[in-house]
Amino acid sequence: MSWSAAQYVKFEDERTRPARDLLAQVPDLPAGPAFDLGCGPGNSTQLILERFPNNPLVGIDSDENMLEAARKRLLGLRFERADLIGWTPPQGAALFFANAVFQWLPKHIDLLERLVDALVPGGTLAVQMPDNLDEPSHLLMQETAEERAFAAAFSGRTIRRVPLPSPRTYVERLAPKVARVDVWHTTYYHPLASANAIVEWVKGTGLRPYLDALPANRRKDYLAAYAEKIRRAYPAMGDGRVLLRFPRLFIVAVKAA
C-alpha cells in the first residue's frame, strides 16, 4: 500500500492531536531508547523528542515517502524503514509509541505483547488507533467499492481493515505483563470546511487501499461516487462546515519498575 506524506499533512493539526493526548498519559521514562512506530512524516516523533530529549529516539516506518518527509523535518534524527509485521523489537527500550499504525495489522496484539516484553523495567507502551470502521466515512468506502461500476476491481480481495478487538481483550492480554494498563476511547469532532474536506482527509489514510486496488483510470470515478455519498451523510452546519466524528482507542501499558 502506498502513502503520501503531502496528503497526510493536509490535516496535520487534527491528526497530531491524538498523539499529543496519548503522550500526555505517558509517565516519566527510565533510561533507554524510545521508538516511534509508524512515525509517518515525523509529527509524532517531534512531540516525543520535545517531551523526552534525553532518551535516544528512533522513528520506524514502512513507507519511504513518509520517512523522507520525517528526515527533512527532524534533521539528524535516526529513522529506519521496517515493516512492523516482521519487525523484531529491540530489547531494553524505554518507550514504544505508536500513533495510528496498529489498526492496519490484524494480529497486532501478539506484537503488543512482544513490545511489552522488550521494555526495560518502568518502560511504557503507548498506542492509539482509529476505531472508526462503523462511521459513514468508512462504511461508504466499502459501499462504493461494491457498486457494479467498481466491484470487479475488488473481487476476491479483502480491502476493509479488520475491526479492532474489544478493550477487554487488550486488558486481558496485557495486564499480566505490566504494572498498569489503561484503555480508553476518545471521540473527536472535527469541524471541516466541507464534505470534500472529509474526502481529502481519508485520501491520506483509509481510502489508500481502495484507491491502490483500482486501475488508475477508475480512481477519479470512484472518488466522485464516494464524495457524493459523503455529501449526503455529512450535511452542512449553519456556518457551512461539516462535522467529522472520529472515535479513537488508546492504550497505555507501564511495566513494573
UniProtKB/Swiss-Prot annotation:
<keyword id="KW-0808">Transferase</keyword>
<protein>
    <recommendedName>
        <fullName>Trans-aconitate 2-methyltransferase</fullName>
        <ecNumber>2.1.1.144</ecNumber>
    </recommendedName>
</protein>
<dbReference type="InterPro" id="IPR023506">
    <property type="entry name" value="Trans-aconitate_MeTrfase"/>
</dbReference>
<keyword id="KW-0489">Methyltransferase</keyword>
<dbReference type="InterPro" id="IPR029063">
    <property type="entry name" value="SAM-dependent_MTases_sf"/>
</dbReference>
<comment type="function">
    <text>Catalyzes the S-adenosylmethionine monomethyl esterification of trans-aconitate.</text>
</comment>
<keyword id="KW-0949">S-adenosyl-L-methionine</keyword>
<dbReference type="GO" id="GO:0005737">
    <property type="term" value="C:cytoplasm"/>
</dbReference>
<dbReference type="InterPro" id="IPR013217">
    <property type="entry name" value="Methyltransf_12"/>
</dbReference>
<dbReference type="Pfam" id="PF08242">
    <property type="entry name" value="Methyltransf_12"/>
</dbReference>
<comment type="similarity">
    <text>Belongs to the methyltransferase superfamily. Tam family.</text>
</comment>
<dbReference type="GO" id="GO:0032259">
    <property type="term" value="P:methylation"/>
</dbReference>
<dbReference type="InterPro" id="IPR023149">
    <property type="entry name" value="Trans_acon_MeTrfase_C"/>
</dbReference>
<dbReference type="GO" id="GO:0030798">
    <property type="term" value="F:trans-aconitate 2-methyltransferase activity"/>
</dbReference>
<keyword id="KW-0963">Cytoplasm</keyword>
